């Protein structure tokens, strides 16, 4: 395996390579490659979002995060339909995330909830056909981030420009990596497979309805950044009940541990370092092999 090929491994693959090393020298080499991969990934993400913020305004840095997330995910993930139609869908998803998230913010909570339901229906029914691909963790999350960090006026015009550039970049990367894949399905087949008796359709409807309802309730209760409640709901809604119950139990423990860690860092670190707590978290994610 070449150095470049080893850099392409995910965390699990890298850790298995380290674990199966035959000699100490070989293990140290694989550890060094693994650490280097994490370092350049974090550095690339930081530089990408920084450049996006410079070009389109600091208030649109979250849009840079969404674009970066889409590029990194959809260079490998796909929609299991014709590559050309998938690329068009991806562009449509960017329009949906940018326009509908802004529109919902301008409306009362209950009416905004209906807009969110319609927007998520498009994303989930057409973009999250295979739950094992976890496309909802990209598309729905991206929508909710833009919804929670909405902008207006000139800043929104800059967001439109930034997301348009992001859509072009993502579509180019996506089509380049997936144009040789062969799928018999087309968009119409995704709609035809809607079946209220299937586990997948029930899961999709749960995502589409429950997430906006949770956000609406949080907004009616005057909670700040209500979209985080929606993200929490989205992340635990899984197709199988046993998996959902397992994740909820893990999430309770994880949230408590996360709050404690953040509080400790907040009081131990000097205030100039606060802005880098997210980067520290990103490095921690780089060492993770699974998501619970």
How does the language model describe each region?
Residues 1-137, 141-292:
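Alpha-helical transmembrane segments and their membrane-interface boundaries
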